[in-house]
């Protein structure tokens, strides 16, 4: 949502952002910004600032979880932009600070929308309303806009959970003194994995996220639950001692069910359009979920610039036509959890430039 707002604002559109949270906070943890996404931050005018925040690994490394042997290594240096890993909250703050503060509206939980031939009205739970020409639903896997378009459909549990934790301060220093830590690494063993990387330029914060297939869990409607170190030890008992040391050094550990949704028959309806997880949620196993949302935002902006706001319907059609194949491919590979498990060429992911891609007008147009 922040990317879409920034890009549309920079393109001259009058943009208001409605956020249900009462204020901005540094939530979340690590996120990858590949070269394909950094090119969009370049367009936003935020590339250098973002680069200064994150760690820039030379390569992505895959290791055998039992013995630490390298299974694959992919350089990320030759794709026309930097690859960084950074704290999600720091990246979001950079985007938010680029927006007109008078156009940011917090504490706005959407209740409903009403379309007319001339505009669309948003109704919020606090009793206020807002009117716009179009509404971009960048509201995640539990998207209210998606629900309005297609009806209530609970997310589908994928059969996987993710443990997440940060390592900082003296615990990180002690860990690093005893074990070599890769800048960005994914550990694989049997049916589970653990990805670890730094989230700051100073390398003073190390983050890991796992993928584990347990039985279905009941979160009581919450996005995540607190976990305990013993659960991590149990889940990764067969992993290398370096992983055991990382678990011991972890601060609070949380556990998140990974949910999916069925593919959408349409990405827009009337004056409403979806992007990102609201449209094509995926498991985080390629670290490209947010990336696909940001590419969506860039293509949607291009199509609205090309067609004009008055021709929003045509712009939405072009946007879906030019994004669906790539988003679906990334979604499929990510959900299969096979990316870089063995040596392969990742240029189809990182070498992509959403601004260099010609806009297709029909299915038959060659890319």
Q: Where do the language-model regions lie?
A:
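Conserved mid-domain beta->alpha element of the FAD-binding
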Residues: 1-22, 136-137, 196, 230-232, ...
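Conserved N-terminal helical subregion
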Residues: 9-11, 34-170, 215-233, 365-367
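Short glycine/proline- and charge-enriched loop/turn segments
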Residues: 19-22, 72-79, 213-218, 334, ...
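Accessory recognition modules or surfaces
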Residues: 20, 25-36
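Conserved protein kinase catalytic core
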Residues: 25-26, 145-146, 282-284
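Long, positively charged, glycine-interspersed low-complexity recognition regions
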Residues: 50, 130-131, 304-367
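Flavin-dependent oxidoreductases
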Residues: 165-198
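FAD/FMN-dependent oxidoreductases across multiple families
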Residues: 178, 190-192, 198-206, 212-286
């Amino acid at each position: 949502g922040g990317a879409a707002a920034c890009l549309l604002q920079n393109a001259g559109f009058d943009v208001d952002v409605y956020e249900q949270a009462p204020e901005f906070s540094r939530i979340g943890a690590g996120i990858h910004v590949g070269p394909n996404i950094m090119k969009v931050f370049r367009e936003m005018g935020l590339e250098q600032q973002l680069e200064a925040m994150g760690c820039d690994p030379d390569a992505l490394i895959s290791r055998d979880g039992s013995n630490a042997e390298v299974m694959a290594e992919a350089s990320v240096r030759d794709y026309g932009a930097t690859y960084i890993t950074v704290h999600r909250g720091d990246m979001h703050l950079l985007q938010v600070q680029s927006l007109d503060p008078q156009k940011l509206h917090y504490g706005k939980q959407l209740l409903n929308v009403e379309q007319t031939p001339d505009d669309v009205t948003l109704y919020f739970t606090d009793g206020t309303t807002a009117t716009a020409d179009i509404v971009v639903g960048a509201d995640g896997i539990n998207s209210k806009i998606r629900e309005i378009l297609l009806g209530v459909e609970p997310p589908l549990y994928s059969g996987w959970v993710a443990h997440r934790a940060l390592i900082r301060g003296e615990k990180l220093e002690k860990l690093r003194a005893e074990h070599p830590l890769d800048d960005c690494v994914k550990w694989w063993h049997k049916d589970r994995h653990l990805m670890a990387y730094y989230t700051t330029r100073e390398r003073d914060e190390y983050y890991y996220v796992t993928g584990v297939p347990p039985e279905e869990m009941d979160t009581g409607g919450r996005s995540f639950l607190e976990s305990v170190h013993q659960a991590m030890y149990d889940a990764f008992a067969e992993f290398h001692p370096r992983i055991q040391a990382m678990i011991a050094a972890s601060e609070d550990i949380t556990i998140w069910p990974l949910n999916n949704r069925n593919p959408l028959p349409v990405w827009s309806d009337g004056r409403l359009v979806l992007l990102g997880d609201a449209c094509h949620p995926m498991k985080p196993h390629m670290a490209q979920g947010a990336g696909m949302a940001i590419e969506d935002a860039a293509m949607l902006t291009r199509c609205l610039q090309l067609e004009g706001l008055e021709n929003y319907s045509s712009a939405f059609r072009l946007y879906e036509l030019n994004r669906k194949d790539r988003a679906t491919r990334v979604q499929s590979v990510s959900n299969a959890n096979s990316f870089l498990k063995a040596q392969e060429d990742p240029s189809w992911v990182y070498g992509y430039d959403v601004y260099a891609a010609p806009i297709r007008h029909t299915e038959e147009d060659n890319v």
